[in-house]
Amino acid sequence: MSKIKSHSGAAKRFKRTANGFKHKQSHTSHILTKKSTKRKRHLRSMNQIAQSDKALIVRMLPYI
């Protein structure tokens, strides 16, 4: 039986941790002048994905 392919788009966006997956937050690449320093600082951190999305990510990334 052939190997399952990983979803390349998901592989670029999600990293596995001990408790699930983490991802970078959005709204950080452009139009930053109207956003406060506090908002931009909080957006720099990585977030855990929701438990409801975990099964979908695991299915897209079988070997990661």
UniProtKB/Swiss-Prot annotation:
Supply the NCBIfam families for this chain.
rpmI_bact
Question: Which family does the UniProt entry place this protein in?
Answer: Belongs to the bacterial ribosomal protein bL35 family.
Q: Which keywords has UniProt assigned to this entry? A: Ribonucleoprotein, Ribosomal protein
Q: What protein name applies here? A: Large ribosomal subunit protein bL35
Q: Could you provide one GO biological process annotation from this protein's UniProt record? A: translation
Checking Gene3D superfamilies in the record gives: 4.10.410.60
The question of whether RNA-binding is a record keyword is answered with no
Task: Look up the record and report any one GO term of the cellular component aspect.
Answer: cytosolic large ribosomal subunit
Q: Per the record's keyword annotation, is NADP included, yes or no?
A: no
- Where do the record's region annotations for Disordered lie? 1-48
Provide the species name: Marinomonas sp. (strain MWYL1)
Compositional bias of kind Basic residues = 1-44
Q: Which GO terms describe its molecular function?
A: structural constituent of ribosome
SUPFAM superfamilies cross-referenced by the UniProt entry: L35p-like (SSF143034)
